[in-house]
Amino acid sequence: MPKYLVIVESPAKAKTIKKFLGRNYEVIASNGHVRDLPKSTLGIDIENDFEPKYITIRGKGEVLAALRKAVKKADKVYLATDPDREGEAISWHLYYALKLENKNYSRITFNEITKTAVKDSIKHARDIDMNLVDAQQARRVLDRIVGYQISPILWAKIKRGLSAGRVQSVALRLICDREEEINLFIPQEYWSLEALLDVKGSKKPLEAKLIGNKEQKIEIHSEEEMNEILSYLKGKEFTVEGVKVTERLKKSPLPFTTSTLQQDASSKLNFAPQKTMRIAQQLYEGVNIKGQGTVGLITYLRTDSTRISVEADAAAKEYIKEAYGAEFVGAGTVAKKDDKKVQDAHEAIRPTYMTNSPASIKDELSRDQFRLYQLIWNRFMASRMAPAKYENTSVKIAAGDYRFNASASKIAFDGFLSVYNINNEKSEGNVMLKSIDEDTKLTLNNLEPKQHFTQPPAHYTEASLVKTLEEFGIGRPSTYAPTISTITARRYVVKEKKNLYVTELGEAVNNMMKKAFASIVDVNFTAMMEGLLDMVEEGKVHWKSVIENFYPDFEIAVQNAEKELEKVKIEDEVTDVVCDECGRNMVVKYGPYGKFLACPGFPECRNTKPHFEKVGIPCPMCGGEVVLKKTKKGRKYYGCENNPECEFMSWQKPSTVKCEKCGSYMIEKGKKLVCSSKECGFVCSMPEDAKEKETSGESVSK
């Protein structure tokens, strides 16, 4: 009996696939890439047609030895790495590292790790797609050239430890440009007017908004203008001029792409893109489900396609019919394909088995796995469901020369909202509106003028930044999360209450990049380069020609930057904590585990201290300050500033409220307070003044 070897990236994926194949199949993981460019040098021979100098990655010797041993025993080798550019490149590197040119081998791909998909991929085995490999090589070489040649300039001109990149530098520029828009924004005053009108037979007054006069809509820019209108309306009769009832359909959403999954997980679950991708990877590669073994729960997570297979569409609609009724089954919203942005080889992100509803496997998943899986499940089911139907009623009201409008919206049919109510939509307005007749006289109860000011553009969040990058065609599904992770890790931006704020360091880097490398941080140029990479994938352009056309101007820019750019001094954040060894005020520095305090007298004085943030709550055990800390793995917890003398520690934020049953301190859980004593278990609502309490951000050391 012939023996087959299947090589995948991860042990989890190997474990899931193994159960689908017979005893004559061995499945081994390469643990990601086995060859790459060297870290210590550029690794690209500029003079020799930009030839990459690949080396075996340090630490991969044992893995390759095991793989070579398995290859010798196998009659055929299947390279089953992920179905994208990166996966194709890993297979290509394995081909060379394992010397498969004289071996019977094939490349297989699947968008979901199911028995049907894996076995079908073996039936449709193929050669390595060199267009995909070359697209990955072009990206890798471009990114290496940009990063390795600009980063040392930033080290020399600003400070060490900085980096630049084709996508990360554009992302930083977008955030800086938005910050500038916000800073330059000048609020404009405007007013609105609402009339509260009594309707015969209704206890609740009708709320009608001023929309204009007989001829046109009007804008009110000052209190004087508003007072003129109020004076005119005194004593005027309010009469119903027309009632209009219309039906509106709200289409079901498209299933998730990588971008939209990251956006929704950020806004709904408060997951950073990096966390979303990590958990989605677990769901894709396989989770142990009782009675089923290791199961891949979702399709491939790096995709910009909203396409759904015929089989998955039919299975979802059958599930919807049984669970909700035939009237809830929809046609399924069809996406408009944009060739500039969509690589449509994959499906959208969806569940693999309709039998594994979130509720049925909740106990088998971690909390985060369940929440993300439920989000994916609900979105996919919603995409196959009927539209929601609204009954909209609009009442036009005349008051002399002015016109008011009252409206109500009633959900007539939930449709997809029954599983995926994005904005918690519900019926709004006075539902009695449609029963009001034309020419009905209404009694004025009150006129309520309100002053407003136009608002500046919103700060970017991780979700809105991902959306913008995708809209501009910058980066690909695999790059959004690491891009945001990099600019936050470099301290170019900080995240506060979901908003991304540029730091002084980020501004300095962005200004230098705009001055010396304008094209690198130009949105349109970066999008054009992405388009060229797509053309390489399609076999329309040779990958080295992309580099050849890019490099000459870039080389000149690097040479000019080295000569002409002046040094920029970034001042450290000085604290009121005094160094107990030399008496200087300590400054905030950043390390692998976040902030710490360091003496500015380095290297003469090497004193450092942990940096904590006060949360404005006295320690329940000793009365000292409770401070927010982090474990070495980055998990946040609350401790006492007097540690180690005081051993107080809590994973949840403690409250100043004492338990009314046992006197122990309470801890915050959502909008509730829970007694810290497990024996007590008392729960109560959080006092209003305790909600949304901000940390002071003061430096504390011990």
Regions found by a protein language model. Give the residues of each.
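Alpha-helical scaffold elements adjacent to nucleotide-binding pockets in ATP/GTP-utilizing enzyme cores
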Residues: 16-20, 66, 89-97, 117-121, ...
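Metal- or metallocofactor-binding catalytic centers and their adjacent structured scaffolds
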Residues: 216-254, 440
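Intrinsically disordered, low-complexity regulatory segments
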Residues: 1-140, 149, 212, 220-223, ...
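C-terminal or mid-to-C-terminal helical accessory/interaction module adjacent to the motor/catalytic core
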Residues: 113, 117-195, 246
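Basic, low-complexity terminal or inter-domain segments flanking catalytic cores
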Residues: 2-4, 16, 25, 151, ...
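Conserved short loop/turn motifs at secondary-structure junctions
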Residues: 82-83, 159-163, 245-254, 264-269, ...
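Short helix-coil junctions and helix-kink-helix linkers
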Residues: 260-272, 466-476
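Core structural elements
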Residues: 139-149, 167, 197-199, 248-260, ...
